């Protein structure tokens, strides 16, 4: 699907939210800092998916449903079609957790249930390509070392789409992050966590899993650096990629800087 208008600088980025407790967190603030208008589309509240012609970028959040749960959540199929259209139009796309699985599925990769739950504070290890990546690579975001602190909450996992670049792994789940093209990223893990999201998550986490303030602060600090780089690369056209608002009656929320 080709872009009908090559200049989308004034069009809002759509954040597709699937459940109340998995909002954009730091993603929305970083976009606002760059002057990017954001529309949060609450699919769990019955909001309609936007047209590809109306968005300047796409962020797809997590949720407890799975890629294959289309009987219970019929919008999942439409969301994948929108993701594919955004990739084909060379728009910036960020998929987080379920969103990464949806991105992988939209690009033809298999999504399956894994052997174990991966839940709670942790880290991912960057691959050789991940260490050189303009978003995740320490040379670009100022991080030290080759690991990225994050929060995990998943069991489903994805195969890598064809022609994608593998960026990060854990021992339990080697496919933690990938890039397709220069501006489409899938992150199985969460770096958007801030104090508000952590507060919403704590009572929902499995017994024995804690999310202490120190872990949240580390993830928020690192996450903002990673997200800053993602937005910078997206807005620059990714030339170097070779190495809250109020709800309206549709269920969408408009956030503007």
Identify the residue ranges that each predicted region occupies.
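N-terminal beta1-alpha1 cap of cysteine-dependent amidohydrolase-like domains
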Residues: 1-89, 125, 205-257
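Short glycine-/acidic-enriched loop or helix-start segments at secondary-structure transitions
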Residues: 24-26, 50, 69-71, 103-106, ...
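Active-site metal-binding loops of divalent metal-dependent hydrolases
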Residues: 63-64, 100, 191
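Catalytic nucleophile loop
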Residues: 86-110
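Pocket-forming structural segment of enzyme catalytic cores
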Residues: 107-195
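A glycine-centered loop/beta-turn motif at secondary-structure junctions
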Residues: 163, 174-218, 229, 233
């Amino acid at each position: 699907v080709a872009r009908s208008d090559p200049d989308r600088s004034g069009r809002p980025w759509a954040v597709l939210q699937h459940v109340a407790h998995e909002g954009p967190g730091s993603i929305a603030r970083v976009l606002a800092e760059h002057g990017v208008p954001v529309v949060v589309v609450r699919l769990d509240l019955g909001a309609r998916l936007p047209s590809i012609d109306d968005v300047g970028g796409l962020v797809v959040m997590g949720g407890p449903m799975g890629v294959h749960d289309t009987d219970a959540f019929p919008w999942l199929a439409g969301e994948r079609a929108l993701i594919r259209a955004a990739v084909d139009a060379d728009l910036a796309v960020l998929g987080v957790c379920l969103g990464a699985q949806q991105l992988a599925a939209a690009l033809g990769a298999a999504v399956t249930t894994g052997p174990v739950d991966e839940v709670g504070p942790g880290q991912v290890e960057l691959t050789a390509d991940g260490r050189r990546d303009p978003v995740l690579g320490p040379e670009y975001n100022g991080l030290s070392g080759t690991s990225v602190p994050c929060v995990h909450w998943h069991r489903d996992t994805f195969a890598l789409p064809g022609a994608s670049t593998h960026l990060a792994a854990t021992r339990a789940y080697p496919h933690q992050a990938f890039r397709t093209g220069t501006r489409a990223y899938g992150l199985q893990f969460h770096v958007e966590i801030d104090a508000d999201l952590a507060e919403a998550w704590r009572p929902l986490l499995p017994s024995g899993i804690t999310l202490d303030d120190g872990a949240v602060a580390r993830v928020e600090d690192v996450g903002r650096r990673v997200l800053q780089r993602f937005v910078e690369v997206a807005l620059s056209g990714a030339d170097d990629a070779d190495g809250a608002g109020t709800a309206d009656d549709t269920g969408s929320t408009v956030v503007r800087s």
